[in-house]
């Protein structure tokens, strides 16, 4: 099994030294991620492309490799190819005909060739010879150069012919870690998830900073989002998840700050804390999901007042994005379901929040704030390797039984997304299975027959454990985690 990796175009226009560095990093990223799935994977650097090879040709392995490659920054597209040697022009035709000839019935087609090396024929001559032979010897609806039903793609490199059997779209962007690290202020909602993704795609290693306003349930929900983004788009590198217990700060604001300024002051306190966390981590920029005009604290004036609290660079990739565009992108990257069911914690509520805060007035209000409270929560911040979320959950979930057997009056609850459920149906013989996606558990679990015990199932086991903790937090005790032997 072979794949040809096409580089993100902006990589190819860099200077030779920068391009070499970026391609080498991408090569390492691909190797790190794919070898977790398939130890036989090798990655070769061919200057203008990367060649990925695997000795495992099973359909299951192929699907896993395609999934991982499609979510890796730095790849514009990748071609699934069959590599064969050839002797002459007619041999190219015969090998192409053996693969594509039977697929031409009732279709228009064309042949496209890319060639590298010295040969006695041109790329156009190959297209004409192979296309003419297929048209004469196989039933079809003829050759159509524009918008054919089937485009046959061939790549020739010296004495090797690559028959392209599938073309997959890549994520684009720069390879992970070619840009500097950032610290994303993540809340679990639509905006912060998309903002984090955009910086991953741009090649930055994204660490996550969460300000907890709602207890364990809130933290569990946000960890799900951060873990999902890391595991799907950036698992080639280690990142940190930082949790800051911010309830005491909210309490101090409610007690000391004028009503209209509460939102702005809360954001300034968050930026103070995040800047300190970033400094300790050696990170020079913060990322937020703020967009001009979306809420009262996000007017240009208020954002300016917020930014003046720190010298740390604050990056806002969504600053002029419409809310619907953000939601659409969240849906595309897979974070919409998390955001829709994320608990809302409006710890600071202003009856009449100002949209044009005066800097001097903000400073006067903050003079009443006890900054020892802020220092204490910064000191109490918990920093973990994001890979430990699964292990941490394992320890926390000990009070929730894990089992691989189904007893009487027990039902397996498949909490995977509809797409996962459809792609890989889970129906073990002799067991009752109900499909209820994880993002509906918070609103629909209580509607189930509570006389039964439910065994939560997902493929990797992380989501089922996190959801078990969340339901436990909500007071449900008829829960176990199901794990296959």
UniProtKB/Swiss-Prot annotation:
<dbReference type="InterPro" id="IPR049962">
    <property type="entry name" value="THUMP_ThiI"/>
</dbReference>
<keyword id="KW-0963">Cytoplasm</keyword>
<comment type="pathway">
    <text>Cofactor biosynthesis; thiamine diphosphate biosynthesis.</text>
</comment>
<dbReference type="GO" id="GO:0000049">
    <property type="term" value="F:tRNA binding"/>
</dbReference>
<feature type="binding site">
    <location>
        <position position="289"/>
    </location>
    <ligand>
        <name>ATP</name>
    </ligand>
</feature>
<dbReference type="GO" id="GO:0005524">
    <property type="term" value="F:ATP binding"/>
</dbReference>
<dbReference type="InterPro" id="IPR049961">
    <property type="entry name" value="ThiI_N"/>
</dbReference>
<dbReference type="Pfam" id="PF22025">
    <property type="entry name" value="ThiI_fer"/>
</dbReference>
<keyword id="KW-1015">Disulfide bond</keyword>
<keyword id="KW-0547">Nucleotide-binding</keyword>
<feature type="binding site">
    <location>
        <position position="298"/>
    </location>
    <ligand>
        <name>ATP</name>
    </ligand>
</feature>
<keyword id="KW-0808">Transferase</keyword>
<keyword id="KW-0784">Thiamine biosynthesis</keyword>
<dbReference type="GO" id="GO:0004810">
    <property type="term" value="F:CCA tRNA nucleotidyltransferase activity"/>
</dbReference>
<dbReference type="InterPro" id="IPR026340">
    <property type="entry name" value="THII_Thiazole_biosynth_dom"/>
</dbReference>
<keyword id="KW-0676">Redox-active center</keyword>
<protein>
    <recommendedName>
        <fullName>tRNA sulfurtransferase</fullName>
        <ecNumber>2.8.1.4</ecNumber>
    </recommendedName>
</protein>
<dbReference type="InterPro" id="IPR050102">
    <property type="entry name" value="tRNA_sulfurtransferase_ThiI"/>
</dbReference>
<dbReference type="InterPro" id="IPR020536">
    <property type="entry name" value="ThiI_AANH"/>
</dbReference>
<dbReference type="Pfam" id="PF02926">
    <property type="entry name" value="THUMP"/>
</dbReference>
<dbReference type="Pfam" id="PF02568">
    <property type="entry name" value="ThiI"/>
</dbReference>
<feature type="domain" description="Rhodanese">
    <location>
        <begin position="406"/>
        <end position="485"/>
    </location>
</feature>
<dbReference type="InterPro" id="IPR001763">
    <property type="entry name" value="Rhodanese-like_dom"/>
</dbReference>
<dbReference type="GO" id="GO:0002937">
    <property type="term" value="P:tRNA 4-thiouridine biosynthesis"/>
</dbReference>
<dbReference type="InterPro" id="IPR003720">
    <property type="entry name" value="tRNA_STrfase"/>
</dbReference>
<feature type="binding site">
    <location>
        <begin position="185"/>
        <end position="186"/>
    </location>
    <ligand>
        <name>ATP</name>
    </ligand>
</feature>
<keyword id="KW-0694">RNA-binding</keyword>
<comment type="function">
    <text>Catalyzes the ATP-dependent transfer of a sulfur to tRNA to produce 4-thiouridine in position 8 of tRNAs, which functions as a near-UV photosensor. Also catalyzes the transfer of sulfur to the sulfur carrier protein ThiS, forming ThiS-thiocarboxylate. This is a step in the synthesis of thiazole, in the thiamine biosynthesis pathway. The sulfur is donated as persulfide by IscS.</text>
</comment>
<dbReference type="GO" id="GO:0009229">
    <property type="term" value="P:thiamine diphosphate biosynthetic process"/>
</dbReference>
<keyword id="KW-0067">ATP-binding</keyword>
<feature type="binding site">
    <location>
        <position position="267"/>
    </location>
    <ligand>
        <name>ATP</name>
    </ligand>
</feature>
<dbReference type="GO" id="GO:0140741">
    <property type="term" value="F:tRNA-uracil-4 sulfurtransferase activity"/>
</dbReference>
<dbReference type="GO" id="GO:0052837">
    <property type="term" value="P:thiazole biosynthetic process"/>
</dbReference>
<comment type="similarity">
    <text>Belongs to the ThiI family.</text>
</comment>
<feature type="disulfide bond" description="Redox-active">
    <location>
        <begin position="346"/>
        <end position="458"/>
    </location>
</feature>
<feature type="active site" description="Cysteine persulfide intermediate">
    <location>
        <position position="458"/>
    </location>
</feature>
<dbReference type="GO" id="GO:0005829">
    <property type="term" value="C:cytosol"/>
</dbReference>
<keyword id="KW-0820">tRNA-binding</keyword>
<dbReference type="InterPro" id="IPR014729">
    <property type="entry name" value="Rossmann-like_a/b/a_fold"/>
</dbReference>
<feature type="domain" description="THUMP">
    <location>
        <begin position="63"/>
        <end position="167"/>
    </location>
</feature>
<dbReference type="InterPro" id="IPR036873">
    <property type="entry name" value="Rhodanese-like_dom_sf"/>
</dbReference>
<dbReference type="InterPro" id="IPR054173">
    <property type="entry name" value="ThiI_fer"/>
</dbReference>
């Amino acid at each position: 099994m072979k794949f040809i990796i096409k580089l993100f175009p902006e990589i190819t226009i860099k200077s030779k030294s920068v391009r070499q560095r970026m391609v080498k990093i991408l090569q390492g990223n691909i190797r790190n991620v794919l070898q977790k799935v398939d130890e036989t994977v090798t990655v070769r650097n061919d200057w203008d492309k990367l060649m990925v090879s695997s000795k495992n040709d099973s359909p299951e392995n192929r699907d896993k490799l395609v999934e991982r490659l499609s979510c890796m920054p730095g790849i514009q597209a990748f071609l699934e190819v069959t590599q064969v040697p050839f002797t002459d022009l007619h041999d190219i035709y015969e090998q192409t005909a053996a693969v594509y000839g039977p697929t031409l019935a009732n279709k228009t087609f064309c042949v496209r060739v890319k060639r590298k090396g010295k040969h006695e024929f041109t790329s156009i001559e190959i297209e004409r010879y192979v296309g003419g032979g297929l048209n004469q010897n196989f039933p079809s609806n003829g050759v159509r150069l524009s918008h054919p039903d089937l485009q046959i793609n061939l790549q020739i490199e010296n004495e090797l012919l690559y028959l392209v059997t599938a073309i997959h779209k890549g994520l684009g962007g720069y390879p992970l870690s070619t840009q500097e690290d950032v610290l994303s202020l993540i809340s679990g909602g639509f905006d912060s998830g998309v903002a984090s993704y955009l910086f991953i795609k741009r090649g930055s290693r994204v660490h996550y900073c969460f300000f907890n306003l709602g207890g364990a349930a809130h933290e569990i929900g946000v960890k799900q989002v951060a873990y999902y983004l890391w595991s799907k788009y950036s698992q080639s590198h280690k990142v940190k998840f930082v949790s800051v217990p911010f309830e005491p700060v909210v309490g101090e604001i409610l007690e000391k700050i004028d009503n209209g300024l509460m939102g702005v002051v809360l954001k300034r306190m968050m930026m103070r804390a995040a800047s300190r966390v970033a400094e300790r981590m050696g990170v020079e920029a913060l990322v937020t999901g703020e967009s001009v005009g979306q809420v009262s604290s996000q007017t240009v004036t208020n954002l300016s007042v917020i930014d003046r609290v720190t010298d740390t660079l604050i990056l806002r990739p969504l600053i002029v994005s419409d809310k619907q565009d953000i939601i659409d992108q969240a849906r595309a990257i897979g974070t919409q379901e998390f955001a829709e069911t994320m608990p809302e914690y409006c710890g600071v509520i202003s009856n009449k929040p100002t949209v044009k805060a005066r800097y001097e007035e903000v400073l006067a209000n903050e003079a009443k704030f006890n900054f020892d409270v802020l220092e204490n929560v910064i000191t109490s911040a918990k920093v973990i390797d994001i890979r430990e979320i699964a292990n941490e959950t394992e320890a926390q979930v000990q009070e929730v039984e894990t089992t691989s057997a189904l007893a009487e009056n027990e039902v397996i609850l498949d909490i995977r997304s509809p797409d996962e459920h459809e792609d890989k149906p889970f129906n073990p013989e002799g067991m009752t299975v109900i499909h209820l996606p994880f993002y509906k558990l918070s609103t629909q679990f209580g509607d189930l027959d509570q006389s039964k015990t439910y065994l939560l199932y997902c493929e990797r086991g992380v989501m089922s454990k996190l959801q078990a903790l969340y339901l436990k937090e909500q007071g449900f005790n008829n829960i176990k985690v199901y794990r296959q032997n």
